[in-house]
A protein has these predicted regions:
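Positively charged n-region of N-terminal signal peptides that target proteins for export
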Residues: 1-4
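Bacterial N-terminal signal peptides
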Residues: 7-15
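Short glycine/proline- and aromatic-enriched beta-strand/turn motifs that initiate or cap beta-hairpins
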Residues: 20-74, 143, 148-150, 213-231
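Gram-negative (and chloroplast) outer-membrane scaffold detector with strong preference
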Residues: 21-24, 70-158, 168, 215-227
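Transmembrane beta-barrel strands of outer-membrane/channel proteins
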Residues: 34-44, 83-89, 139-145, 175-177, ...
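Short acidic, glycine/proline-rich loop/turn micro-motifs
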Residues: 48-53, 95-97, 151-157, 200-204
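Predominantly the C-terminal beta-signal and adjacent terminal strand-loop region
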Residues: 90-94, 173-231
């Protein structure tokens, strides 16, 4: 009986050891280890109410071009996670309440009403689902910041308040379709809804602090390297 129990325990231990070794094996997959993406899109924006400078930046819901690039780490099932950034040079109508004084730490000039341009830049953490050969669906989720910089009056190039620009939190969700020319070369077309949340300091209760920015984007995604899994 003792010999039987000893033999049984040895079989259990050996089986457990072999199972642990199998679980620790590393396999190479055909999935890309990284994705590099470049895209161009058109977006609209409603505007920003800035209570600190008593100014409004009206984008007029006009369509403007936006350029995007991302670097993502490949994951399972065609998903990836990484960082992305966009840039757009945006025309807008600047208006300010000149009877409201600027804070002592604010810089830049103001106008009652004038045409101007600014640089709009975003930097986000991005999650992308959908990749591979042939047609496939896409889902994209972003979270990060939007920066409004270089607010300048068109007529004379004067820097408008706030002179240092402004940075707001930004969130985005998108859905679309892609076509894979190969497992590592994809063309994506995606519709996104993005919104930036501006600070409420100095705003009346009825003033909006949300800049809504829907967009359509065409992107080229290229996969590089390889990915391994442990089982």
């Amino acid at each position: 009986m003792r010999r039987f129990l000893f033999a049984f325990l040895m079989v259990v231990l050996v089986a457990g050891s072999l199972g642990a070794q199998r679980r620790q094996r590393t396999y190479a997959t055909n999935d890309p280890g990284f994705w590099l993406t470049a895209g161009i899109g058109g977006f609209t924006a409603n505007g920003v109410n800035d209570g600190v400078t008593a100014s409004t930046w009206d984008f007029g819901s006009a369509t403007n071009f936006q350029y995007r690039a991302s670097l993502e780490r490949g994951m399972a099932n065609g998903s990836s996670f990484g960082i992305a950034g966009t840039f757009a040079r945006v025309p807008f109508a600047y208006s300010a309440d000149l009877t409201s004084p600027l804070p002592a730490d604010a810089s830049g000039s103001r106008c009652l009403s004038c045409n101007a341009h600014l640089d709009m830049t975003t930097l986000v953490a991005t999650f992308h689902s959908g990749a591979g050969a042939g047609f496939h669906q896409l889902v994209e989720l972003d979270g990060g910041i939007v920066a409004y910089r270089n607010l300048k009056q068109d007529s004379d190039g004067a820097r408008l308040a706030p002179g240092g620009g402004n940075i707001d939190p930004l969130f985005s969700a998108g859905y679309g379709f892609g076509y894979g020319l190969s497992a590592r070369t994809n063309v994506d077309f995606i519709s996104t809804y993005t919104f930036g949340i501006h600070e409420r300091k100095g705003l009346s209760n009825g003033s909006s602090n949300t800049n809504r920015m829907p967009s359509l984007r065409l992107s080229l995604r290229m996969g590089f390297g390889g990915r391994t899994v442990t089982r």
